């Protein structure tokens, strides 16, 4: 986990960081609607898992926006070189297990590690918590394919010093002009603002529209 400490005294967000860090609930969230038609068609043609594809797309976008690589360690802001994935997987008994997947520069390379990681996670009991699933250099992902939600909240321990973004995808919905999917984005306000979430959402949509 390679990271660099940010110089708080010279950081333009110094006041913002200190202001929001004092709050009991420093996270804020928005829900956006993603156009999924091109990604769906591409995955169908290539034989790819759509869910793995949009999880990768979100991670690619997050790594492009520096503030999504910011974390708080020992009360201080740092920036990681690379951010990975920690997602939930549904098990046969309808419970879920945490699954770590390392990011890669291209989708095929990502799949080579993600697929065996997912298989190994499903074989674990309970929540499947490991050192990797607790990594701070990751984004927490969840998928609710049954619900076309318009907003979403997360279970959280306020005493735990969490600063990882949380991204959730919903139900794929067919409409007259194509397919859409809700995506909820929750981030730590001490590390970023709505502008940065907007950058992320645009880059995510751009990736989904690539093919």
Q: Where in this protein do the model-derived segments appear?
A:
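Helical lid/core segments from catalytic subdomains that handle acyl or acyl-like groups
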Residues: 91-149
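A broad, structural surface signal
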Residues: 41, 52, 56-64, 112, ...
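Short alpha-helix boundary/capping segments
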Residues: 46-47, 192
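Acyl/amide activation-and-transfer machinery of modular secondary-metabolite enzymes
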Residues: 23-41, 82-105, 180-186
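Flexible, Gly/Pro-enriched loop and linker segments at secondary-structure and domain junctions
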Residues: 1-31, 51, 129, 136-180
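Aromatic-residue-lined binding/catalytic grooves and analogous aromatic/hydrophobic interfacial grooves
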Residues: 3-6, 32, 42-46, 61
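Hydrophobic "lid/gating" helix adjacent to the active-site nucleophile
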Residues: 48-85, 187
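Active-site-proximal acidic secondary-structure segment that organizes catalysis
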Residues: 108, 120, 161-211
